[in-house]
Every structure is written in C-alpha cells, then in structure tokens.
C-alpha cells in the first residue's frame, strides 16, 4: 500500500468527480489520504469530505497565502478543531516568499501559532516553505528550543542546507511530482541522501502532476509515480519505498489508524 500524505480534495478541481477520484486512488493501492486545510474558516467543508470517505483524513490550519486573513486564529482555536478523530495534523502553515501573498510578518506569526498548536497536541505540523529556506530554518530552530514538535516539510523544493537542518531537528521531508521532473536532478540528490525513516510521498493534488501526467490535473492515485521515481533515486525497489514511506507516515501521523494489513 501507499499513502498520499498531502492533497486538497476540497478544491473545486475535484467537485464533480470526487467519488471517482477516491475510487481510482483505492484501486491504485492508496489506502490513506490526508486532505490539507488552507483556511480555518473553511474547515467544516474539509471535515465533511473526510466524513464521507473512510480512509480520508484532514488537517486544520491556514496556508501562508492566507495568513493575513486569519490572524485572529489562536492556538486554542486550532487545538479545539483537532478533537475530531478525522483531524490528524496542523497546517499547512509556513512561509512562501515566492508569491508573498501575505505580508511576511503575518506569515511568520501564523507559522509560530501553528507550531505552538502542534507542540500542545502532539499532532504533526505540515509546513509549506518556498524560497524561504533561511527564515524557515531559523524559526524551526528557535521554536524547537521552546519544546519539540512533530513536523514535515511538505512539497520539498529547498536546498541541502534546509534539509540538513530539518533532519537535525527531527523533521520529515515529503516529495511531490516535482521529484519526477527532468530539471529536478538537485532535488533527487537530496532525496537520495536523506535517512530512510524521514521520507514521505504526496501529490499536493490537484497541483504538480508527475512527469508522466504533466499538464493534467493531479490526483491521489498518481502518488505511485512519485514513489517509483523516489525508489529509483534511492536505488531500492518500489515495494521497499512503499513500505518505508507508509511506515514513516503512520509513525508521524500517529492519529491515523493503520489498516489491519499494515499494523505492526
């Protein structure tokens, strides 16, 4: 089995065929999916999707693009939303200096709020970081000094220094279809160098379809293609990478129940 540790099933791209998307994912062996929150104010819509589909879980949080719109969201607000058994993570939160859709101060404030919630609940924080390696590492190191928290750098596109510092802090690193792109040799070098127990796979669907489906809408079933390239990059079999990334997922997203066949 495989898992898609990060997708956006509430996005309009899936509105007319969500049932079929879930069926295709399960047919491809994807038994667990985490659909990721981008706005706390839309949390109930996200939670409703998880309640429709067994094996689908969600996070709660504010994407850095929207940080300035949800500065009133408190640690207590986030923690309260995690009481549902279907809510298994915080985020995605972090820093996006590529688009800078929110002021950087708002992004950092939101990032630290989500870290505090992850620390309090023990649930993993899904971190979005783009073209913000130095500040991301700085904030993570400062906040870890206040107390450890579980987290994953999702859709990793950073440099080797951010990867090194994240691993040193105990974080995991997740790869999307970007890993499969021809111009991603440097990213594949990083993926090859990471400890086996810290790697995850995700689609970030509907975005970033892997090379085989480039230009098409992405969906959870396509995580298989990412796992294939990760396996090739690390010189192991697809079965081994599937087992490893799945074990890593359940260790990090510990609130997600394991299927009977995956229980250890």
Short names for language-model regions:
Residues 1-264:
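Mid-domain alpha/beta scaffold segments of enzyme catalytic cores
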């Amino acid at each position: 089995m495989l898992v898609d540790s990060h997708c956006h099933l509430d996005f309009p791209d899936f509105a007319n065929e969500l049932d079929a998307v879930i069926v295709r994912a399960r047919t491809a062996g994807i038994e667990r999916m985490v659909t990721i929150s981008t706005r706390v104010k839309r949390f109930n819509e996200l939670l409703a999707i998880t309640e429709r589909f067994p094996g689908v879980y969600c996070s709660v949080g504010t994407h850095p693009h929207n940080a300035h719109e949800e500065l009133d969201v408190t640690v207590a607000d986030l923690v309260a939303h995690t009481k549902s058994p279907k809510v298994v993570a915080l985020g995605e939160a972090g820093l996006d200096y590529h688009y800078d859709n929110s002021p950087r101060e708002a992004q950092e404030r939101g990032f630290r709020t989500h870290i505090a919630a992850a620390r309090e609940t023990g649930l993993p924080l899904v971190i979005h970081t783009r073209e913000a390696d130095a500040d991301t590492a700085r904030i993570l190191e400062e906040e870890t000094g206040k107390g450890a928290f579980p987290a994953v750098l999702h859709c990793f596109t950073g440099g080797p220094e951010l990867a090194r510092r994240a691993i040193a802090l105990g974080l995991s690193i997740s790869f999307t279809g970007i890993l499969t792109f021809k111009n991603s040799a440097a990213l594949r070098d990083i993926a090859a160098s990471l400890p086996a127990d810290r790697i995850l796979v995700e689609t970030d669907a509907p975005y970033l379809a892997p090379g085989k489906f480039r230009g098409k809408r992405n969906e959870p079933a396509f995580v298989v293609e990412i796992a294939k390239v990760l396996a090739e990059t690390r010189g192991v079999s697809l079965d081994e990478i599937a087992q490893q990334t799945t074990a890593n997922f359940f260790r990090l997203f510990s609130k997600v129940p394991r299927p009977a066949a995956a229980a250890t």
